[in-house]
Each structure stands twice: as structure tokens, then as C-alpha cells.
Amino acid sequence: MNLTRQERRRRERQAYKDSRKKDSDTYEMSIKLLQPWSTPIMKTELPPKILQTMTEISDQVIADKDAESWGKNLAGQINTELLIEHDILNQTGMMAFFLGAVRQFVITCKCQQMPFYSEAIQKEEWITQMLSMWIVSQYPNEYNPAHLHTQCQVSTVMYLKVPEMLPSRKKHRDKDDGSILFFGNASRDIDLSVPQLVCEPEVGDFYIFGAHQQHAVYPFRCAEGQKEIERRSISFNAIFQSKTDYDRGKKNEVPQAAVRPGESRPT
């Protein structure tokens, strides 16, 4: 069969397309990213009911002239840092919520730490206990220098109030002012990772991270004469242990002074 030049070229183009289509077949594959050498930062949002309750609790504590200042135990260059007693958390049901959140974080981290034992980790019972919880009522020009938390294993921060802030002076650094900064040291690969994470706070944001995770909080500025200038957050520290280890008598090496009698019951 004699083909015209035009028909021959058409068939050649079609054959080329068919070969490309065959080479570009897609496949469903199960993928796991294995990263046992770093502790994740878990970010979520407080349910509206939890956010409202914690805001009301913080309002009560700040209004209480006899509230205990917790600043002597903290790194922040911040004037108002107040302790929240565990009784009110138990009475409002907040304690159970936060211990459950810590438990989920621990399970997630343990599964990443030992990815080939994730099934056993998820079947394990994990005991969590809250140590101290405190309010950080931050105002313009106050800040938290780089630091970590000691005598605990897990730390958190939740944001209850975030004021309108003046924009950063430099457009190429527009996310610095008022942000929380997490530092990492697990990877030197600058092509596929970065050594720090800058997070702009929003009302309801809730972060859970390892207690030895270095972090800092940048100061911020507000417009002159602005009325609402408070950035309010709440943090707490916690410890955990597997029920298996607890039953074996392998208790955490945490000084007894870290948990005052009656502060929190393991759950």
C-alpha cells in the first residue's frame, strides 16, 4: 500500500504519541517517609468550646490579684506570666482533653521513632501527666529568647488572643514580628530541609512539641493608640510513660519537685 507523505507523517506522529503514553503509565504505590531522628511539631486547632473555656479560665486568672506569678520559672522577658491551677482544669474537663492530645502526640512520635513497630506502639497504653500550666500575657516589645523546657518531656503552646500588629519593616522578612520560631538540628541537607520554622500565631492554634525543642518568640509592634494590644497564649509541660514500663516499675527520672502533690493525676 502506497502512503502519501502526509499520511506517513501522521502515522509516525501517532506511533510516537502511543509510545509516550505507554511509557507514562501511572502506578499506585504505598510510601512511607522514615525520619526517626527528629521530633515532629504537631499543629492543630482548638475546638471552639475548648478555646472559649480556656479564654474564660485565663480571664479569671488574670483578674485574680492573688494569682501566682510563674515568671521566675520561665525564660520570657514578659511581665505577666501566671500559673493556672489544675483544680480548675479538672472541674471544667480541660485536663482530660489536653492529656488526650499529649497522648496522641506521643503515639505519633513513637511511631516515627520506631516505624517498624507502629502496630505495637498503637496497641500500647500510654500514661500522660501534666506538670505546670501557665498564661503568657504578652504586650508590644516583650519577647521570649531561645530556650527549651527542662524536667519534662512534652511542651505546648495555644493562642487565645492575637492583636493586629504593625507590618514588618522589611517586606522580605514579613513573617517575623510576633511569630514563634522553632529551631531544628537534625539535618544538614539544605536542599530538602530547613533548620528553622517560623509560625505566625492565629487564635485557636495549638502546638505540641518535644520539651527539648529549642524555640523563641519574636516581639511585635502595634499602632500608637491601639486598644487591643495583648497577645495571649497558654502553655503547659507534660511527661509520659508506657503502661508496660510503668508496670515494670521503670518510672521516669523526673524530680519529685516537678509535680506538686495533687497537681495532676496520671491518665
How would you label these PLM feature ranges?
Residues R221-I239:
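C-terminal/domain-terminus segments
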Residues N2-K21, P261, P266:
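Short Lys/Arg-rich cationic patches that frequently serve as NLS/NoLS or arginine-rich RNA/DNA-binding motifs
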